[in-house]
Amino acid sequence: MTTIFDLLGKDADYLLNHKCVIKKEALTLPSGDLVSRVFAESDRNNRVLRSLQQMFSCGRLGGTGYLSILPVDQGVEHTAGASFAKNPMYFDPENIVRLAMEAGCSAVASSYGVLSILARRYAHKIPFLLKLNHNELLSYPTTYHQIFFSQVEDAYNMGAVAVGATIYFGSESSSEEIVAVAEAFARARELGLATVLWCYLRNPHFVVNNVDYHTAADLTGQADHLGATLGADIVKQKLPTLQGGFKTINFSKTDDLVYSELSSNHPIDLCRYQVLNSYCGKVGLINSGGPSGQDDFAEAVKTAVINKRAGGMGLILGRKAFQRPFSEGVRLLNLIQDIYLDPTISIS
């Protein structure tokens, strides 16, 4: 049987024994009492605390302070055909929820249509996270503009415990999206719902000399900081792959200490800088799994190890799981969860 160590391959020592530049003692780290220890001291009402605790208590990671969320909103974001042609069973929303339940996930995140059509059957069995806004791909030329497909009240009425939204920070529509999401999240808190923000970057000026800085630790870290500023309980971010975005794009501001004292080029240090920007871990960082490819198991394991050792709160992984046979999707999600359950894989 292939082990986590086998899947890490030549990177095993590099990832498992790294010591971070920013010490873990500077962070608020995931633990079973996280809701009581962190959020109970905030202005969040008791119903929000209950909703958060439902996610942190569900599935194989229940009681650990970590989350394993299955997100399937790609039918809107990337078109249904592109998302489900490899595995047509997921055109049926019920199989999305079944996958999350069978794999022992903390929650299932999807669109209003997917979750509402199954709410009476499943909302009391697994936490629902309603994704409120989406970017659709039928318009030409392609634009990056998140549009609300549903309202916070829809989440409340179907029995969801949380709402999610995306902001394309840096895009032409970012100011409009910030205002809309701030209003939606304020309403969600009134209704007792937890909030998760997809803190993505979209700006053509973030690509310089054919180098894409949309996954730079400094730029994505600032997006996380903006998400925390909006009051998100959890921020979702792509795993950082490089550093120095601010130094290259020639606008906005940074400090040389960011690169000399607060991070390095090691992937765990890059991810830790994201955690640092998420209020030193008080707002949980979950990283995304990315698209499906030939080495999904190895890539997913590395992403989980990096996130955990950096002080992150878990993974929100979709395409790698549902664009393969059902049983393999369950196995992949369980493998990721095993990393967060393994006490020998420690926070750096």
Curated annotation (Swiss-Prot):
Top-level EC class as recorded in UniProt: lyase
GO cellular component: cytoplasm
Active site positions: 236 (schiff-base intermediate with dihydroxyacetone-p)
Keyword Cytoplasm included in the entry's annotation: yes
Keywords: Cytoplasm, Glycolysis, Lyase, Schiff base
Compartments, record wording: Cytoplasm
Molecular functions per Gene Ontology: fructose-bisphosphate aldolase activity
Predominant place of localization: cytoplasm
Catalyzed chemical reaction(s): beta-D-fructose 1,6-bisphosphate = D-glyceraldehyde 3-phosphate + dihydroxyacetone phosphate
EC number: 4.1.2.13
Stored InterPro entries: Aldolase_TIM, DeoC/FbaB/LacD_aldolase, DeoC/FbaB_aldolase, FbaB-like
Membrane is among the record's keywords: no
Superkingdom of this protein's organism: Bacteria
UniProt xrefs under PANTHER family: FRUCTOSE-BISPHOSPHATE ALDOLASE CLASS 1
Xref: NCBIfam families: PRK09250.1-2 (NF006705), PRK09250.1-4 (NF006707)
Similarity comment text for this entry: Belongs to the DeoC/FbaB aldolase family. FbaB subfamily.
Name under which the protein is recorded: Probable fructose-bisphosphate aldolase class 1
Organismal lineage: Bacteria, Pseudomonadati, Chlamydiota, Chlamydiia, Chlamydiales
